[in-house]
Regions:
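A conserved beta-strand-loop-helix scaffold within acyl/acetyltransferase catalytic domains
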Residues: 1-140, 185-186, 218-227
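C-terminal catalytic domain of photolyase/cryptochrome flavoproteins
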Residues: 65, 78, 111, 157, ...
Length: 227
């Protein structure tokens, strides 16, 4: 744990998908052991069986109505938890006006109605997943909208990495790889900062052990058993 002035460095586990020059989603699935390959296919099929289709919008093709729809889904995620959204519609409209930012939205559709969406941002070599929401409760819709659609988009567009956001051991079984990331935090009170620094040092040792365990325990390994 390094401390410089009022800043602390905190390490944590992060899940990243890597594109090993896959030609298609089916090609990607060939890396998996048969059991987990079947599980993923079953999850995707369950969405198709419910007549859910996806429409991808990116950049300037995202009109104002689409942003309104996305925002309503984003808010629903917080309402379901009894919370208030911390971003407002003005923020999303500001994104739409920034030409240097490339948003990508995966809209889930039932018949002609949008029923959910995930918002990503496309960088030079990475797709970043950040927000999602839905106005229906449907098993596996989150995995399809937030993981599989993004993976397929990366494969089809030659994008090297997919960063779907922090947390979620369930990403491991779907092919995301764990790595160590660093965040910086400013703590002005010295006593408080020293206490946090001590905790973070101990935590980092545990994170290192956790990451090594995850690397040896993946859906590509013959010993993979995560349920």
């Amino acid at each position: 744990m390094r401390v410089k002035s009022c800043w602390l460095y905190k390490r944590y586990a992060w899940y990243i998908w890597k594109n090993y020059d896959y030609q298609s989603f089916s090609d990607y699935l060939e890396r998996f052991k048969s059991r987990q390959r079947k599980n993923i296919l079953k999850e995707r099929k369950s969405i198709k069986d419910e007549k859910i289709e996806f429409e991808i919008m990116s950049g300037s093709s995202i009109n104002e109505d689409a942003w309104q729809k996305l925002y309503s889904f984003y808010c629903q995620t917080y309402f379901d938890r009894g919370q208030r959204p911390y971003l407002n519609l003005k923020f999303f409209k500001m994104i739409a006006d920034k030409k240097e930012i490339k948003p990508v939205i995966f809209f889930a559709k039932y018949k002609d109605d949008f029923v959910g969406a995930s918002l990503c941002f496309e960088g030079s070599d990475t797709l970043y997943g950040r927000h999602w929401g839905s106005n229906i409760l449907l098993k596996n819709l989150h995995f399809e909208a937030c993981f599989y659609q993004g993976i397929e988009y990366c494969i089809n567009n030659g994008i090297s990495y997919f960063d779907p956001g922090i947390q979620g051991e369930h990403k491991l079984r779907r092919g995301f790889e764990v790595s160590k990331k660093v965040s910086m935090h400013m703590i002005s009170n010295k006593d408080f900062r020293d206490a946090i620094a001590s905790f973070c040092k101990d935590e980092e040792n545990e994170i290192d052990r956790y990451i090594e365990s995850c690397k040896a325990y993946t859906p590509f390994s013959i010993d993979y058993r995560i349920e």
